[in-house]
Amino acid sequence: MSMGLTFLGIESSCDDTAAAVVRDDRSILASVVAGQAALHADFGGVVPEIAARAHAEKLDLCVEEALAQAGLRLSDLDGIAVTAGPGLIGGVLSGVMLAKGLAAGTGLPLVGVNHLAGHALTPRLTDGTPYPYLMLLVSGGHCQFLRVDGPEDFTRLGGTIDDAPGEAFDKVAKLLGLPQPGGPSVEAAARAGDARRFALPRPLLDRPGCDLSFSGLKTAVLRQRDELVAAQGGLHEQDRADLCAGFQAAVAEVLAEKTRRALALAPAPVLAAAGGVAANQTLRTALQAVAAEAGATFLAPPLRLCTDNAAMIAWAGIEAYEAGRRDGMDLAARPRWPLDQRAAPMLGAGKRGAKA
């Protein structure tokens, strides 16, 4: 009896090298992620050259480990899916070249996957969510509202015009002397903080639509920090905690209000969130409340599938393959690759890869 499709997924768009084996019944047989946090810790952010070299060193090992965990050989697979963009081009190229080599050597079908589609389709993998649904994709390099109508049918309703939220979290952590990655550090510090102590702005809430901006909020945190340092000669731990709590509350409030507008603009039975910042519990709580107001179900992936992983790439590859997609040896690595080809290009570029 047929076991259905089984795909290998390969992900290397930023600072996580990953491989996974996934079946079309939504079973994740293996998911391997080799992070690079230690390599970039001294630089306050991801260094593209260091990331690319690390991907080149780890990709084949991750694939071997994923196959071993799944108890499969390459000959047991039905296809290979690989992130072909958007992202840091050196890492994306490493993954694409490995996938091409494996496809050429085995004769397996090759499917190039948009990294953002991997995040956007994660609710299909984790919960079997039917189309359509509204997706808030919120990560280190990207932030956009998408109506998802199919594996390659996305309508962008709005997005960030400057920094992505994850980038803002990283920069605020750096300003306050907290370790990277900034998201978990800021969230941890905020638990002991008073979000009401500092009057931080809620950017673009006075303008209609679903576009977002976070660079002014980051600058406001910088000003408050500098005022505290000038007044008392440094920052106390409570100062850091209060600044983190205020910043986190501002981000959550902005995203909640813009999500409310997106649901009004494109009503959907399900509101989903994905991307690394979707792991933030304050944000999840705010989005859950917005979904309840609109009579929608709120879904967020398990934390291990919020951040970059190859299981989502394998799944997106399966969906694209079932829709008739095939790629050849001319598959190109793309630093920019908008999900909604009809929408105007987003402004700016995030630290973790080009906006799309």
From Swiss-Prot:
What is the top EC class of this enzyme, as a single word? transferase
Q: Which SUPFAM superfamilies match?
A: Actin-like ATPase domain (SSF53067)
Principal location listed in the UniProt entry: cytoplasm
Q: Where does substrate bind?
A: L137, V138, S139, G140, G141, D170, G183, N280
The positions annotated for binding Fe cation are H115, H119, D308
The catalysed reaction is: L-threonylcarbamoyladenylate + adenosine(37) in tRNA = N(6)-L-threonylcarbamoyladenosine(37) in tRNA + AMP + H(+)
CDD domains per the record? ASKHA_NBD_TsaD_bac (cd24133)
Protein's UniProt keywords contain Cytoplasm? yes
Any Pfam family? TsaD
- Note whether Transferase occurs among the keywords: yes
Keywords from the UniProt entry:
Acyltransferase, Cytoplasm, Iron, Metal-binding, Transferase, tRNA processing
Instruction: Cite a single GO MF annotation.
Output: iron ion binding
- State its cofactor: Fe(2+)
* Enzyme Commission number(s): 2.3.1.234
- What's the superkingdom here? Bacteria
**Cofactor comment in the record?**
Binds 1 Fe(2+) ion per subunit.
Q: Which GO terms describe its cellular component?
A: cytoplasm
Compartmental location: Cytoplasm
Listed under GO biological process in this entry are:
tRNA threonylcarbamoyladenosine modification
Matching NCBIfam families: gcp_kae1, T6A_TsaD_YgjD
Q: What does this protein do?
A: Required for the formation of a threonylcarbamoyl group on adenosine at position 37 (t(6)A37) in tRNAs that read codons beginning with adenine. Is involved in the transfer of the threonylcarbamoyl moiety of threonylcarbamoyl-AMP (TC-AMP) to the N6 group of A37, together with TsaE and TsaB. TsaD likely plays a direct catalytic role in this reaction.
The entry's family comment says: Belongs to the KAE1 / TsaD family.
Protein's recorded name: tRNA N6-adenosine threonylcarbamoyltransferase
Record the organism: Paracoccus denitrificans (strain Pd 1222)
Top-down, what is the taxonomic lineage of the species of origin? Bacteria, Pseudomonadati, Pseudomonadota, Alphaproteobacteria, Rhodobacterales
> What gene codes for this chain?
tsaD
